[in-house]
Amino acid sequence: VLLMSCFFAYRILTFSNSEPMGYLLARLICFVFALLIILQNIKSKVTIWGPTFLAVSYVLIVTFNILIFTQTSINDFTDAALWPLLFLTIYEVTAQNCISEVSLFRILKITKIVCLGYSFVLVIEHILGIIPGTSEMFPTYVLLALVPFSLYEMDMEHGIKFNVIYLICTFLIMLMTSKRSCILVLAVGIMGYFLVKAKIQGRNVKAIVNKMAKYIFAILVIFFAMYFVTKLMKLDIVERLNEMLNGDTNGRSAIWENVLEAFNASTLSKKMIGHGYHAFRFYKYSGYMYILNGNLAHNDYLNTLYDYGIIGVAVYVSFLLSMIKELLLLIKKKSEIAPAFTFSIVLLGFLTFVSYFGIESRIINYVAIFWGYTLAIKRFDIKN
């Protein structure tokens, strides 16, 4: 935790990429932090837990790529290494019972209020065109990434009214921004949440179907209400949903083909260990494809394959699969964590294929904290 504090203090104080020695120090701290976690497990004679090992491995792969490939000079190393370090840190701190759940929920409440306010302002600016080029994308996705914690808090019977309001506001913002993947994640994720919750509570199929029918009806009512509102505001929600249903990927298929062509043209060593952090973003993403208002491949697996090679994508996919395995174990044991955890896996499933998730430490951060916190509680049976 001390090493992490030093690292982020350094990043705050030096917001420039003109200091190579400082960047070397920042990378070295990440490397040492990862090794210390392994040594701690060995010294305490505790079997290294699979996801912990995979998260450490991912940090080491990112560090190796940035140290070796000088062409991938970056202005923010935390983009790559932050989320696995957050997962490791919150897991270790929670496992040692050094965190108060009440304090965590208070911090999350403040975070949600700030993110909601920020997102509403950006969405209004975007709709009215007050500030040209205003991007509401990442505040919107951050709202989505905080949903698993809201569902978990409600299951713990903490702040139910506030979190219901938060979920409603989040859904309205998704409709206003016409983010198709976000709308689908919310719809499918909440359905999955109710289904798993009904299963672990031992309710019958009829009760589940009735619950889902009411939920779908509520969504349709809200959707049609928003449809008439957005017609007046000249938004394109219905048009964008229609494009999605007709298979229009907004140029993504062309980018995916470009990634595969670039990867196939690489040397064997590059295919194995990758081209370096954000190599595709800075060196292969150009021309007409830049209209996608982003710089990545819009597919985590292809992006990771090009940047970190076969080894990197194998570690990344293995970590994500380990989270799916944990969900199945939670459902099998009828854990109260399982319903909220289900939403996080739905989020993973959609965003890794058609948007951003773990390739940058933005959307995934709160999900990584949620995974580390809840899995430490489950693994060590921590109370209060």
Which residues does each predicted region cover?
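N-terminal signal-anchor transmembrane segment
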Residues: 1-41, 57-70, 83, 121-134, ...
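Aromatic-anchored transmembrane helix interface
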Residues: 24-32, 49-63, 71-95, 110, ...
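Alpha-helical transmembrane segments of multi-pass inner-membrane proteins
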Residues: 34, 86-89, 99-128, 135-199
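Hydrophobic transmembrane alpha-helices and their immediate junctions
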Residues: 42, 307-349
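Hydrophobic alpha-helical segments of polytopic membrane proteins
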Residues: 48, 148-232, 321, 325, ...
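Long extracytoplasmic/lumenal interhelical loops at the membrane interface
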Residues: 132, 246-308
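Transmembrane alpha-helices of multi-pass inner-membrane enzymes
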Residues: 146-151, 340-353, 357-384
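Flexible juxtamembrane loops connecting transmembrane helices in multi-pass membrane enzymes
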Residues: 205-211, 223-258, 282-285
